[in-house]
């Protein structure tokens, strides 16, 4: 039996991560004999802490061991299991990524130009998100359709965000859209 693929392992761990209300954001298999690695990136709306990641890592390890004992998987000479969160450099590609990063700054690559905006609310259908930008002293609100979203990554912010930006990011999608109409 061959070393399991990322797709096979993702399907196998799906029930375990679902019971913990986690999403698999990535699973990478690196085959290197006894130094093979299975790296799993998990996230959730409530930001998993280290204690939860430790519990889930234990559960996944036991699941892999049991499947290997039954002959359903073969890791060969062994493997290292890494379970972590994706980190801030993960591109925002799904509506849940935008929802989880509400009020944070995001860097967007629009027509080859870098654009920085604060993430506001998603609409009810989770197909569009509010972006808040500061132009000198004034704030502007734009609606970004996620289907046409450029590459976007969360920006690390060292200074405390301006309160007016946070207030606007905290409004509902419809309230923020109304703000642009005035």
From Swiss-Prot:
Principal location listed in the UniProt entry: cytoplasm
Classification via Gene3D superfamilies: RimP-like superfamily, N-terminal
Keyword Magnesium assigned: no
Keyword Acyltransferase listed: no
Source superkingdom: Bacteria
Xref: NCBIfam families: PRK00092.2-2
The family this protein is said to belong to: Belongs to the RimP family.
Protein name per its UniProtKB record: Ribosome maturation factor RimP
Organism, scientific name: Corynebacterium efficiens (strain DSM 44549 / YS-314 / AJ 12310 / JCM 11189 / NBRC 100395)
């Amino acid at each position: 039996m061959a070393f399991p693929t990322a797709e096979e392992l993702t399907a196998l761990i799906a029930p375990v991560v679902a019971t913990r209300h986690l999403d698999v954001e990535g699973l990478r298999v690196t085959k290197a004999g006894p130094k093979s690695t299975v790296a799993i990136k998990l996230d959730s709306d409530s930001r998993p802490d280290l204690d939860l990641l430790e519990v889930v890592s234990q559960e996944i390890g036991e699941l892999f061991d049991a499947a290997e004992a039954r002959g359903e998987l073969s890791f060969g000479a062994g493997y290292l299991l890494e379970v972590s969160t994706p980190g801030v450099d993960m591109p925002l590609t799904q509506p849940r990524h935008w929802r989880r990063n509400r009020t944070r700054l995001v860097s967007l690559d629009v027509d080859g130009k870098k654009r920085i905006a604060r993430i506001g609310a998603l609409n009810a259908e989770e197909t569009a998100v509010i972006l808040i930008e500061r132009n000198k002293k004034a704030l502007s609100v734009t609606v970004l359709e996620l289907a046409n979203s450029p590459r976007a990554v969360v920006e690390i912010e060292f200074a405390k965000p301006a309160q007016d930006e946070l207030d606007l990011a905290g409004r509902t999608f419809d309230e923020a859209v109304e703000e642009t109409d005035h």
